[in-house]
Amino acid sequence: MASPSEQYIFGEFSDDEFKQFFVTARCTVELPPYNEHFFPCGPQSSGDFQDGEECPRIEFGIEEVIDHNTTLPNNTDYSISSNLNPQAPEFILTCSSSPKDSNNVLHENNFDAIDCQFSESSIPDGSGNADSDGTSGTGQRERKKKKKRPPGYYSYLEGVGDVPSETLLNGHANSAGLNSISTDDPDLAEDIPISTTSPRTCTSPDNFVDLNNEALSDDASMHNVLDNTRTAGQPEECSVTSSEQSCIPSDNGRESPVRTAVVQPFAGTDTTENLGVTNGQTLESPEEDTASNGVVLHPEVISLSEEAKAEEISTAQAVIHLPGSASANAPAKSWASLFHNSKPSSTPQVAYVETKNTPPVTSLQVTEKQVEIKEGPVPVSEDPVAIKIAELLEEVKLVHKPVSLQPRGLINKGNWCYINATLQALVACPPMYHLMKSIPVYTKAQKPCTSTPMIDSFVRLMNEFTNMPILPKAKQAPGEKVVRDIRPGAPFEPAYIYRLLTVFKSSLSEKGRQEDAEEYLGFILNGLHEEMLALKKLLLPQNDKIHINNGPDPVFATEEVNKEEQEGSDEEWEQVGPRNKSSVTRQADFVQTPITDIFGGHMRSVVYQQSSKESATLQPFFTLQLDIQSEKIRTVQDALESLVARESVQGYTTKTKQEVEICRRVTLEELPPVLVLHLKRFVFEKTGGCQKLIKNIEYPVDLEISKDLLSPGVKSKIFKGQRTYRLFAVVYHHGNSATGGHYTTDVFQIGLNGWLRIDDQTVKVINQYQVVKQTVERTAYLLYYRRVDLL
């Protein structure tokens, strides 16, 4: 069957060459004249052109037909791309098929869906072609034996039919060539986002990315051909002219971010959000795919026509290596050379792309669903929900009831073991868990900026854990410890907790610094305390001010006495102690918050001086610092007794510059609901710097605070149940070095009525004797106790 319109090419072809390179009504090839005569060689369906008569001259480019009176079929099912060597499978043109209709039956019978050439599968028996019985412009030709092709040579022709199939790009579904970016130009390399996502091909027009078109080609039918055949996430089809490459975007009225002809990340990704990454900056953009230099750019159509070159624009040249293509610097090839060499050149083709430098947009486009998030904490006056949280914290009542949570490990992708170990202990603390669960979780739309990043992060952390029902104890014998298996939840990475170190510019985030679990615990508790103080200030009248205490800091005896002698102390009163001895007690301004109600206690430091009244200072604490350096200290009780022992201060002088002897004694004035004991294993020595004390310190599961440790004024007020504690978490330090090591945590699980050992994302059940048993490699560092009367 003849083609719809007659086209002519020049030169003699063999049967196989004619079949392979016969050009359909989509395009024609002009070869040098053969003996200066024109010979029609296309199949004729009419007698419009006679033998030897000149046919209309049609210029043919590598990828396009430059003809204002184009004869291309107005069909959007085909696309043309560069084909320097049609015999090589890697140069097969991109094309897709569509269901047939009555208007396209003629085309479907005569044209193959790949490269739009005649193929054996597309020509029915008895149909006329250039080598059959039908007449052609060059006369009757003798049939020749068909050349043998290697196995699988025509495999790329399989699957072409009515059902849309996966589109081939240069003979392959993988568009690796688009990701092969030359880094010869460092400026370009910085501005080009490189996607590592594996591309997917798709023939559905709904998945294509449409670009604004400002300068379309003169040939409208070319746009119809090129519009629907691009791979999803692939740049526009490119037309190469004079060793330069220009891209023709699809003509669609919808706006979308710019796609340059140099490189384009593929649309198919494994993440839930599309992120445009440029120059190291990541922008969350659910609806916008790409951002350039932090702003969304609108497309500029790139053209290498003479009119576009005449415009006053700044251009940037980019080099793209196209594997499997001929080198751009190679000498020009004649059309006849196509028949002599079917092997692709090993030298990659270098295509130069000219792009316009679009002026930067001053404002970033933000969708309706997106809300601008300010970096870092803001003042409480700018926080839209700060007053709500303040009112909630003012009315909150601490809940000490144990809660059974499904354990979850924490993924450690860095040196975060000291953080993970501390977080697991805090999650196992019932009043801490209930406090954070009482604060609602706000969305970004409800809370676009925050004055409480630490509170927000720990509210989010506690909501990562779900309740697990407490197992019945009916079958449990008295005194028997039942250990059951447990199925932990999926581990997760609390990256929002790690970021707090940089938000508050903590010294723990400094490189090369030893991470310390006790120091991190103080960082967390002090940070939460300060944020709650700032919220509490919102509820007070404007003339009332709160002095924000940065948390309990250690006070040395000499500094303390000097402060006591200064006039205008914060607060002081005179007390009459035993034997009618009076003492002056001073206390710094201290405002309670829910954090201090859980972890906060008070110590009384009394200074004794000859011929002077006793002076006492109350100072708060979150953790009790226990010195274990002495050889006499083998248990926690020994360390507590050493804490309250009287010590002498040498070298103290009065205002008269007379050296006097003074003594100091520390006692416990107020015991917190949650008592954290810090075993000070890291000490500084004059010869060896910081060293770790590797010694076993025995600690009981049930700890009783002796009355001798209490201040004289509270001994009779605190009952035994209020000074008895039970262990619920232990943080261990692994290793013998003070400048390295690892941290793990054992926590008591009320649902199991037993203990769990958590090492980052590993969770396993252990027995109680394994908790109190220490080894040389693993030593207890932080002990978490709860008051028995609150259990």
UniProtKB/Swiss-Prot annotation:
GO biological process annotation, one example: negative regulation of canonical NF-kappaB signal transduction
Alphabetical UniProt keywords: Autophagy, Cytoplasm, DNA damage, DNA repair, Hydrolase, Nucleus, Protease, Thiol protease, Ubl conjugation pathway
Reactions accelerated catalytically: Thiol-dependent hydrolysis of ester, thioester, amide, peptide and isopeptide bonds formed by the C-terminal Gly of ubiquitin (a 76-residue protein attached to proteins as an intracellular targeting signal)
Comp. bias (Polar residues): 118-139, 270-284
Record domain USP: where: 408-788
Lineage top rank: taxon: Eukaryota
SUPFAM superfamilies, alphabetized: Cysteine proteinases
Region of interest (Disordered), ranges: 118-156, 270-291, 560-580
Cellular compartments annotated: Cytoplasm; Nucleus
Main location: cytoplasm
Active site: C417 (nucleophile), H742 (proton acceptor)
Keyword Ubl conjugation: no
Signal peptide: none
EC numbers for this chain: 3.4.19.12
GO cellular component: cytoplasm; cytosol; early endosome; nucleus
An MF annotation (GO) of this entry: cysteine-type endopeptidase activity
Function in brief: Hydrolase that can remove conjugated ubiquitin from target proteins such as p53/tp53, rps2/us5, rps3/us3, rps10/eS10, becn1, snx3 and cftr. Acts as an essential regulator of p53/tp53 stability: in unstressed cells, specifically deubiquitinates p53/tp53 in the cytoplasm, leading to counteracts MDM2 action and stabilize p53/tp53. Following DNA damage, translocates to the nucleus and deubiquitinates p53/tp53, leading to regulate the p53/TP53-dependent DNA damage response. Component of a regulatory loop that controls autophagy and p53/tp53 levels.
Similarity comment text for this entry: Belongs to the peptidase C19 family. USP10 subfamily.
Protein name, entry field: Ubiquitin carboxyl-terminal hydrolase 10-A
Originating organism: Xenopus laevis
Source organism phylogeny: Eukaryota, Metazoa, Chordata, Craniata, Vertebrata
